[in-house]
Structure formats: C-alpha cells, structure tokens
C-alpha cells in the first residue's frame, strides 16, 4: 500500500513563502518615497500600457511588484473598495490604513487557504488633505498579508539590497521633487544587472523609456495623483557623471 504524501504545516508555509519571494525577486524594482510635497513613485518599467503605479483614490496611490495579473486584480479591488466606502459614507473615510488592512486580509487569506499564494508585494501611499500638515504615510503589504507602515521610503522587487543601501545613504525628508527623482533613479540603477558588454563596475543608465514615475502632490486640491513622463521627466534624471559623485548637501540633486 502506498503511503500518502505528508508535509507539516510549517513546511507548507515555508514552501509557499519561498515561491512568493522568488516570484517577487524576478521582477524589476519599485521605489516609493516621501518628499517635501508628498509621495514619489519610481518604477523600472519599460511598458507604457501595463502600469506598476496608479491612483487608488483622491489622496491615495498604489505601487506593486510581482505577477501583473495578480496585483492588477488587487488594484482594481482596491479602487472598488474605496469608491464604495466613499459613496456610502464620506470621501474622508477612505484612508490608506483602511485600504492597507483590506489588502492585508485578502493576501493573508489567499496565502493560508489557496493552493498558491500571490507573488506580489504592494505599497499603499497616502497624503493628508489639501491644506493640512498631516505627514505622508506609506504601507507595505507582503504576499502573506504582513503589513508595515513606513515614514520615509519603501523598496520592493528585484535586488533590493543595493537600492536600500543607496537610499539610506542619501535620503532626506525635505527633498524637492527633482532631487527625489534623481535619488530614486540613481538608487534603481544600482539594483539590476550590468548591461551586456559592460563590467559590473559600470553603473546602469535608466532613461525615460525604462521608467514609470508619478507623484501624490499635496499642493493639488482634490485628486493628488499625477504622472511624470516625457521631457518633464527627462529634465529631472541624473546625468551619468552625477551618479558617481558623493551625496550632495540638502537641496542639490542627489546621486
């Protein structure tokens, strides 16, 4: 008689975690950071149609890495959740914390009850109401439903260690938009493999066509989300020489 296959609950959870982490690590990285006027999203994403960064509600933004079809389902569900709550109660009742909790419950349920976990990691960003001094808030939600709040920046997907190191070395809370873009792009350039025909010592260069950039701008009265592309983005990108310089003083363009 053939003995049935047995795996302990701990082993099953470890296998699911490993599957999800590997899937997330295969993707390109995303950096979300707070700056002087709100929240900046910078994703390495050559696609013009399949977005990693999007608007959720008036003052809420969304960023994700992993399997596109999975985080797109989560994004759309989040928009429906926010719209229904805002319509049923008040637009001010739609908060980043409520959406982050909803995402955490959904991902936690999928991780424990479904045959395969979602291979995604997401960030919900929130800025205060127009005219308020409420600081921006970032919520990171992982594949197993774990949730953490951040005040400065979040790095997700790909090879995160060199990106996190670069961000920690140069990040400052009151960066202007251009400095924040240069910092995030410079950090992303350190996170991927060296281009073919170059050595690992030579940094990558990410141009406008390889980036998806957006902001939650606290100076906008209602819908704070805005994409930055084309010539507006190109003017903000760091030059190759600038990425090799030491981190500048506050107000200058960081590497």
Curated annotation (Swiss-Prot):
Coiled-coil annotated spans: none
Name of encoding gene: prcA2
An example Gene Ontology CC term for this record: cytoplasm
Compartments it resides in: Cytoplasm
Function: Component of the proteasome core, a large protease complex with broad specificity involved in protein degradation. The R.erythropolis proteasomes are able to cleave oligopeptides after Tyr, Phe and Leu, very poorly after Arg but not after Glu. Thus, displays chymotrypsin-like activity, low trypsin-like activity but no caspase-like activity.
Regulation of its activity: The formation of the proteasomal ATPase ARC-20S proteasome complex, likely via the docking of the C-termini of ARC into the intersubunit pockets in the alpha-rings, may trigger opening of the gate for substrate entry. Interconversion between the open-gate and close-gate conformations leads to a dynamic regulation of the 20S proteasome proteolysis activity.
Compositionally biased residues, Low complexity: 238-249
Recorded GO MF terms: endopeptidase activity; threonine-type endopeptidase activity
Keywords: Cytoplasm, Proteasome
Key word Cell cycle present: no
CDD domains per the UniProt record, alphabetical: Ntn_hydrolase (cd01901)
Family affiliation: Belongs to the peptidase T1A family.
Pathway(s) annotated for this protein in UniProt: Protein degradation; proteasomal Pup-dependent pathway
Name of the featured protein: Proteasome subunit alpha 2
PTM field: The N-terminus is blocked.
InterPro entries xrefs: Ntn_hydrolases_N, Proteasome_alpha-type, Proteasome_asu_bac, Proteasome_sua/b
Keyword match Plastid: no
Ranges where the record places region Disordered: 229-255
GO BP annotation list: modification-dependent protein catabolic process; proteasomal protein catabolic process
Assembly behavior: The 20S proteasome core is composed of 14 alpha and 14 beta subunits that assemble into four stacked heptameric rings, resulting in a barrel-shaped structure. The two inner rings, each composed of seven catalytic beta subunits, are sandwiched by two outer rings, each composed of seven alpha subunits. All four combinations of alpha- and beta-subunits (beta2-alpha1, beta2-alpha2, beta1-alpha2 and beta1-alpha1) yield fully assembled and proteolytically active proteasomes. The catalytic chamber with the active sites is on the inside of the barrel.
């Amino acid at each position: 008689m053939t003995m049935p296959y047995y795996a302990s609950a701990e082993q099953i959870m470890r296998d699911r975690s490993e599957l999800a982490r590997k899937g997330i690590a295969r993707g390109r990285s995303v950096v979300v950071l707070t700056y002087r006027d709100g929240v900046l999203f910078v994703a390495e994403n050559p696609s013009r149609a399949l977005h990693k960064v999007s608007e959720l509600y008036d003052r809420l933004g969304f960023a994700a890495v992993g399997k596109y079809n999975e985080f797109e389902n989560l994004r759309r569900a989040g928009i429906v959740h926010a719209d229904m709550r805002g319509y049923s109660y008040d637009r001010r009742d739609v908060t980043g914390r409520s959406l982050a909790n909803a995402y955490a419950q959904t991902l936690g349920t999928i991780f424990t009850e479904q045959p395969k976990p979602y291979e995604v990691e997401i960030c919900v960003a929130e800025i205060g109401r127009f005219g308020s001094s409420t600081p921006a808030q970032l919520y990171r939600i992982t594949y197993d439903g774990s949730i953490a709040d951040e005040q400065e920046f979040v790095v997700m997907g790909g090879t995160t260690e060199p990106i996190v190191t670069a961000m920690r070395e140069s990040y400052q809370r009151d960066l202007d938009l251009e400095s924040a873009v240069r910092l995030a792009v410079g950090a992303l350039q350190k996170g991927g493999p060296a281009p073919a025909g170059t050595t690992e010592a030579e940094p990558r260069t990410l141009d406008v066509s390889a980036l998806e950039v957006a902001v939650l701008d606290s100076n906008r009265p209602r819908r704070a989300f805005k994409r930055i592309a084309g010539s507006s983005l190109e003017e903000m990108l760091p030059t190759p020489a600038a990425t090799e310089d030491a981190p500048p003083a506050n107000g200058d363009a960081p590497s």
